[in-house]
Amino acid sequence: MNMETSHAKLFSLLFILLNSAWSIASSSISESFVQCLSSHIQNSNSSNGIILTRTSSAYPSVLDSSIQNLRFSNNSTPKPEAIITPFDESHVQAAVICSKKNGLQIRTRSGGHDYEGLSYVSISPFIIIDLFNLRSIDVDIENESAWVKSGATLGEVYYSIAQKSKVYGFPAGTCPTIGVGGHISGGGIGTIFRKYGLASDNVIDARIVDVNGRILDRNSMGEELFWAIRGGGGSSFGVILAWKLRLVPVPPAVTVCHITKTKEQGATKLLLKWQNIADKLPEELFIRPVIGSGDKTITVPCFLARLRNFSI
C-alpha cells in the first residue's frame, strides 16, 4: 500500500513539473512573439489594440466571438498564445513573420463558420489572426467587379452590391454571417451556382500574405497558387487579405417558394423525382431540400426570373 502511495505521489509530482515546464516555455514563446510583433508595428498608434494575449481583458470575448461549434469553447480546448486583430495589411505581415520566427502555428479566422475548429484550434502552440477589422468592400459596377477584404461577411457583400445596383449579384452562400475569406477559399456554393458556378469560380484576383510575409497578387503569386487558393483552402497557403470578385447579372425580381412534405405525403418520392430530372432543369432554377429531424422535409426552389418565364 505504501509502495502504491509513493508511486501515485511520484506521478503527481512528475505531472506538476511537466505542466510547469510547459507553462514556462509557453509563456516564454508568447512574450518573444509579442516583443517581435510590437517591434514590427512601430507605425501603429497602439499595438495593444492589435495584440491580445491571455492576460488581456478582451481576449476571452474576442476568442469566443465567432466560435460556431460550442464544443470548442470549453476549458479543455487548446487556446492561442495570442489573438491578432489587424487593422492594416502590414499587421498581418508582421504576425506571419513573428509566428514563423517563434515556431507558432497560425489559425486564420474571418467569420468563424468552421465547425471542425480549424480556424481557431491547434494541438501545437498557435496564434489566431482574426480578420474582422479588415472588412472593407469596394464595388465597381462599371467594371462588374468588387474588391472585398476577407473579414467582410456575405451579408455585407450582398448589401454593398445591392446599394450600387439591383441587377448585379455574386454567386455565394445563403448565410449572411459567413466570412468571405474562408467561404471563397473553400469553394462557396450558393443559390445561383448552377448558372454561374461556385464563388471561387468568380474570383479574378486576390491578395495573400505568404509564409515569408510577402504580399502577393495574382500576377506575383502565379497561376498555380491562384488556382489552389480558390477551393483548396486559402489558409493552407497563406493569409488571404482580399478577393477581387466578378459580379454577375441577376434579374431585379426572382421567384422563391417553399414546399413542405412529410414522408407520408410523398416527400421521398418527390426527392427521387427531383434527382431524376435535375439535369434537365434550366440552369436558372435552384432547388435545395432541407431534411430535418422533425416530421417534414422542406424543399426550397429559387428561380432567377418571374414564374411566368419558367418552362422545362
Model segments located where?
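A glycine-rich, basic-preceded beta-loop-alpha segment at the flavin cofactor/substrate interface
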Residues: 209, 214-250
